[in-house]
């Protein structure tokens, strides 16, 4: 498909009742956009990082009853899977679109990564004020990155078995960065540029 940007209809897709109906909406309306956006951003990140990156699109295959509250694409250096590695995400809840650098609970280096971020505070202190963090990729709740929740979120990521840490930027459905396509891609690339130093630090 020709990607024209994200619209309010995409957010409404995440409100459709029922697993089968919502998944049909995701597969027909959102995933083609994810593929188009993801291919561009994967190429961009590969060039920026000097390392081949691979696109993954969430399939939600484990779900049998409840529809997913969010859906996303992921970009990672591992072709076989992304969940145990630091990775970039672009995705949707019904209330906002997110662009994250994500460390989810399957990550095998959470202790090392959290301690590095806690020690090297400048890495996160330099992020723009309009960035956000999340302690759980399955929940909509986010916090401004400089709002006093950062240290506690990193400590939880380090100390709790299913702790997570996501950092990036969120966009409400009426945000003018979401369309047209060229504006969204430009915005996403700017966000990724801010997150790349954190990504590199996490891989050290």
UniProtKB/Swiss-Prot annotation:
Q: Give the source species.
A: Listeria monocytogenes serovar 1/2a (strain ATCC BAA-679 / EGD-e)
Disulphide-bridged cysteine pairs: none
Family label: Belongs to the UPF0637 family.
Identify the InterPro entries for this entry. Answer: UPF0637, UPF0637_domain_sf
- Please state what the protein is called: UPF0637 protein lmo1065
Which domain of life does the UniProt lineage start with? Bacteria
The protein's matches in Pfam families, at most eight in alphabetical order, are given as: DUF1054
